[in-house]
Amino acid sequence: MRVIQSICEMRHYRAGIANDKTIGFVATMGALHQGHLSLMKASLAENDYTIVSIFVNPTQFGANEDFGAYPRTLEADIALCERVGVSAIFAPSIDDMYEDDEVGFSAPKKMGYILEGFDRPTHFAGVLQIVLKLFCLIKPHRAYFGQKDAQQVLILQKMVRDLFLDIHIVPCPIQRDSDGLALSSRNIYLSASERQKALCIPRTIELVKKRILQGEREVATLREIALQSLQSEDITLFYAQFCNHKLEPITHIVENKSIFLIAAKVGQTRLLDNLWI
């Protein structure tokens, strides 16, 4: 396994891969967990090469967010990737990836400033900026992203379509801890009592899923069930919303190819979860 830390070396490595070989890519900010490993394993199963990036991207953090505190565990991450069997890690510096007076990026006007983008208006512009840079360097055939970040997945799929990129965005199922909480690098911020409170989020997802499987499709009814479940704990709810794959709100009947998205703060930690229908 190669550990690559410069753009020059990344370009050299990529140029050495034969044209008839496929490349899978997993973009991460490090602090790797089993959710990331599931993305790597999906890539390893479908591609000749799997490249993982580890880069805590400053442009997707807001002014009062946790960029400085975000966990950085590069040595452990490298060991984990080596055990899984990925081909290469790309772990550049901020100075390598960004120059002064960068070309500006913006998120899609409809998709990028609702839900997560409402509370974090610069977030998706930063995500698109770094992912496009990484795509340009690595030139993958497939890129693997977790469905936990549903809005991110849909916006990246739109970017690929809009820019005519020959890259397939592969959404991968949410991975959960034994207690049901969706895996996230930020879960380490939770105290034991906060984690117990946070479990109302996956319980709500399961409750909504169960009612849909039983035949309930009225949005108002399902949302009321969800809100009652979420209000059982002392958490700050940002949204509990049914949307289609264009992130347009569904207000009457839940149909196939819908998503139920939840974002809530437990203590000081923002948590996401969702149900793909």
From Swiss-Prot:
One of its GO terms (molecular function) is ATP binding. Its main location: cytoplasm. Keywords: ATP-binding, Cytoplasm, Ligase, Nucleotide-binding, Pantothenate biosynthesis. It is found in: Cytoplasm. (R)-pantoate binds at Q60, Q152. Pathway: Cofactor biosynthesis; (R)-pantothenate biosynthesis; (R)-pantothenate from (R)-pantoate and beta-alanine: step 1/1. The reaction proceeds by a bi uni uni bi ping pong mechanism. This is Pantothenate synthetase. It comes from Helicobacter hepaticus (strain ATCC 51449 / 3B1). The gene is panC.
